[in-house]
Amino acid sequence: MSVRLLTVRLIKHGRYILRSYCKRDIHANILDQNQLKTRSKRGFPLPSTAANVLRTTPQQAAKSVVNVVPRTINSPSGSPFNGSGSSPTSSSGIFRVGQHARKLFIDNILSRVTTTYSEDLRQRATRKLFFGDSAPFFALIGVSLASGSGVLSKEDELEGVCWEIREAASRLQNAWNHDEISDTLDSKFTIDDLEIGPPIAKGCAAVVYAADFKKDVASDGASLHTDAQPQATPAFAPNSWSTHEMMSPLQNMSRFVHNFGGSVDNVFHYSQPSAASDFVGAQSREQDQRHHEQQQHQNQEQEQHQNQEPSSSAFNVTSPANSNINSSVDSYPLALKMMFNYDIQSNALSILRAMYKETVPARQRGMNEAADEWERLLQNQTVHLPRHPNIVCMFGFFCDEVRNFPDGHLLYPVAQPQRINPQGYGRNMSLYLLMKRYDHSLRGLLDSQDLSTRNRILLLAQMLEAVNHLSRHGVAHRDLKSDNVLIELQDDAAPVLVLSDFGCCLADKVHGLRLPYVSHDVDKGGNAALMAPEIFNTMPGPFAVLNYGKADLWACGALAYEIFGNRNPFYSSSGGMARERGEMTLSLRNSDYRQDQLPPMSDACPPLLQQLVYNILNPNPSKRVSPDIAANVVQLFLWAPSNWLKAGGMPNSPEILQWLLSLTTKIMCEGRPQMGAGLMPVASCGNRRAYVEYLLICSFLARARLRRIRGALNWIQNVVA
């Protein structure tokens, strides 16, 4: 026990003792008088002594108390006794001492188990802070702010500028992603408003037809139909943002220079060649040399066969075919996907309830006013995926009856209803998805064209950006494969990659990307060959969880082999024509493979990206990078200064922010979407080739954070060290 506490207790207890001995018996007299007054009012007879007490005034009662001497009776032993036979003074004194002893005992216990003193001090400090004596406190805050080490640090100010960059890039990205078709679709839209063209593709669960709006429907809305593909509206439309709003980060350039040094001229320092350009330049020089040798050999052969016509006629045969394909794309710019319905009753609400995952990327989600409560609850629990340039452009969806479309009896006779095909097993209604039409799938593009190294890197960067967009919004695709990745081609521009077919996705607001796996009835996803090891090996149990946080990223690592010209290590080629050709290969099993068993990638893939793919395909998810870091690594490889990707080239935060500002300046000044021929968004400089690059840079800036960029740079430094 401390001396201070002991002193406080002695003073407190001594004060109680002094009060007890000096206290007059006033409360007892007042209580007696009140009782006597009550009896007199009720008419009860009072004793003479009581009547005398009532008739006397308080002053007379006080005098009588002083003058009255208590009468005593001498006992045989000589000690005075009163009528009751006990001494009132001694009994009352003992009673008072007992009372105070008990009170001291209780106070001592309460002082040990309560925090009276701490509460008093806390309340006193609060009163001083808010009602008085707060000047020293705020004086310290003023001194800290004046000295520069205040509440906001330099890192916070840098993040503030980075936030402005994200806002400007998001506005520009929204202008690119805007379309007028999804805004005009409503609940009254039906299959009769479309003109159905030839079939494009067919899968096990759906068929895709080329489509376009009918002429009469187009006349009702002037912007609903054009002769070309529906694309983004210009950024400087009447309802779009102005240049002042889009270029808000550039207005803070002076504040950035004042606080962190440097000059505006340093922005152009970051236009130096990146690591990707160096690698691609070396590759292109080697290819040019080989091409020159092949050209000389072909010239020699042409000199020998220059008078022969078969080669020229063969060339003329392929040209009209390509023109017919292009004309069909121009005349049918939309794609209509019809889902096969075998077991769902022909009711719009039932169909939407069973196939709601297909509608996750839809841009227009019209809610019927007569919808049931369960339908509203279902849509509230489902994640709505925001627009992104690397996610399929799905304008909307609707339910309607199944029609007798072209070649339906040949492509899907079993899925047709019996009113169309008597041997069919399909229902009369199904779900229709209206999308933008694309040129190829990733598998078709890789099989038909010989892509350059830079285009392959751009494809990988776009796929990682799409997967990162899904992960940021709590969606897992769970069925990534080369057939579900669509490609848009336009002239000589780099291909645009989008993810499609969300029928097996996980989009749950309740559980997010961590799905409880209590039984085998829970669906793990669609593609078992490209299923992440942590998903494939998880067994059901009361506490088992399927973590899809890095599952789609793992599938991207497997598809990276295909993008750079290698065989997918998790696909096998056995039987059939592969056996006859001697191309039988064994694949890795995603359940028990080791990282050192991964086959080497081709030389077309840069060494840094090879290490990234090997890291993505690590069987242990805790050792993989996150989707955000993986996308940042490829973006840094494409656009960052090459010395940042060398050993010891780690930049500081102001240098990173200057580089981000230079990228923002580039896309704001050069990459603003303008309306080109056919309503195609092109760069303001007219270079369609750079359109994909501007899309990638804008997607990167729309989510740029210094902490995440430094994390990607740290990973790069660990690899190149």
UniProtKB/Swiss-Prot annotation:
UniProt KW Magnesium keyword: yes
Biological process according to GO: autophagy of mitochondrion; compound eye development; ectopic germ cell programmed cell death; establishment of mitochondrion localization; establishment of protein localization to mitochondrion; intracellular distribution of mitochondria; medium-term memory; mitochondrial fission
EC numbers on record: 2.7.11.1
Binding residue positions for ATP: 310-318, 337
Location(s), subcellular: Mitochondrion outer membrane; Mitochondrion inner membrane; Cytoplasm, Cytosol
Domain of life per record: Eukaryota
Active site, renumbered: 479 (proton acceptor)
Biased composition (Polar residues): 310-322
Annotated organelle transit peptide span: 1-5
Listed name of the protein: Serine/threonine-protein kinase Pink1, mitochondrial
Upper classification of the organism: Eukaryota, Metazoa, Ecdysozoa, Arthropoda, Hexapoda
